[in-house]
């Protein structure tokens, strides 16, 4: 007779890796284009720094709420604050959002792979293979996921820093000037674009029940957030500094296009975009897996569905919605809507805090 296993609790580094890997999806490949197009200046790096400080502040407030009310996951917090029925409906909408992000990441990955690697392979085959591999990892639970994510994050950072360092051979600081040439207006207008690139930060709202030491919530959430932010800033500066802002606005995948623009002769591998493609297939995969896992977890908590049933629902839903956009441009438009939902979800605990605080005060009287 098999013994019931105790669910694995995550250490701080695993928590950092989950948050960082979840954020490092399609955003890094498309952020330079989206940010430059919206701001119409090369000052996007200032926007990233500014919004980084804003989100660190919101992360801190969210950790204070978690410590004050000690909720294990946002799904339980919803039911306590809004009641079983309304909480379940909002929980279902959150699961739908998770599946929407998973679908976006899946389609973005398929578009990139088809464009750069497998031009003749039907996109449906690429998507189906990706989904099946992801579900296989999800079935193993968060324990399997948490073992892989630190390794993936380390490999990603090392390869990116090497490739970024090499790309400085075509970098021109003058392409980033003048600083604030058109004032603060373009920076304010581009803040919403940056928020969309922070997709993944909201997983911190669902991780506390899985952590060994909940008192370190702010540590793992903030460090998990800072790693992508630093990489985002480096990417933007290097891409715009090398290609110029007007050219970046015309490219769907400007980060990859940068590394296609130069070669290093006399070494074993001359085309370095191959490394970036490998890294980002991994990052698309990790983002899909964690969103799929929490969608399944939400369906289980909200409706009592089994893991098998949840995975079937996730697979079918992601496959259908990932094929919804007609082309890569529609995929990018799809991400805009997800970004607005992300901001709403990240602000939801603040509303629940006042409702739960009032209900608990009434109950204790």
Swiss-Prot record:
<comment type="function">
    <text>Involved in the germinative response to L-alanine. Could be an amino acid transporter. Forms a complex at the inner spore membrane which acts as a receptor for L-alanine, thus is involved in the stimulation of germination in response to alanine. Can stimulate germination in the absence of gerD and gerK gene products (fructose and glucose receptors, respectively), but the response is improved in their presence.</text>
</comment>
<keyword id="KW-0029">Amino-acid transport</keyword>
<keyword id="KW-0309">Germination</keyword>
<dbReference type="InterPro" id="IPR004761">
    <property type="entry name" value="Spore_GerAB"/>
</dbReference>
<feature type="transmembrane region" description="Helical">
    <location>
        <begin position="187"/>
        <end position="207"/>
    </location>
</feature>
<keyword id="KW-1003">Cell membrane</keyword>
<dbReference type="GO" id="GO:0009847">
    <property type="term" value="P:spore germination"/>
</dbReference>
<feature type="transmembrane region" description="Helical">
    <location>
        <begin position="250"/>
        <end position="270"/>
    </location>
</feature>
<keyword id="KW-1133">Transmembrane helix</keyword>
<feature type="transmembrane region" description="Helical">
    <location>
        <begin position="275"/>
        <end position="295"/>
    </location>
</feature>
<dbReference type="Pfam" id="PF03845">
    <property type="entry name" value="Spore_permease"/>
</dbReference>
<feature type="transmembrane region" description="Helical">
    <location>
        <begin position="148"/>
        <end position="168"/>
    </location>
</feature>
<comment type="similarity">
    <text>Belongs to the amino acid-polyamine-organocation (APC) superfamily. Spore germination protein (SGP) (TC 2.A.3.9) family.</text>
</comment>
<keyword id="KW-0813">Transport</keyword>
<feature type="transmembrane region" description="Helical">
    <location>
        <begin position="223"/>
        <end position="243"/>
    </location>
</feature>
<feature type="transmembrane region" description="Helical">
    <location>
        <begin position="45"/>
        <end position="65"/>
    </location>
</feature>
<keyword id="KW-0472">Membrane</keyword>
<feature type="transmembrane region" description="Helical">
    <location>
        <begin position="12"/>
        <end position="32"/>
    </location>
</feature>
<feature type="transmembrane region" description="Helical">
    <location>
        <begin position="303"/>
        <end position="323"/>
    </location>
</feature>
<dbReference type="GO" id="GO:0005886">
    <property type="term" value="C:plasma membrane"/>
</dbReference>
<protein>
    <recommendedName>
        <fullName>Spore germination protein A2</fullName>
    </recommendedName>
</protein>
<keyword id="KW-0812">Transmembrane</keyword>
<dbReference type="GO" id="GO:0006865">
    <property type="term" value="P:amino acid transport"/>
</dbReference>
<feature type="transmembrane region" description="Helical">
    <location>
        <begin position="122"/>
        <end position="142"/>
    </location>
</feature>
<feature type="transmembrane region" description="Helical">
    <location>
        <begin position="338"/>
        <end position="358"/>
    </location>
</feature>
<feature type="transmembrane region" description="Helical">
    <location>
        <begin position="85"/>
        <end position="105"/>
    </location>
</feature>
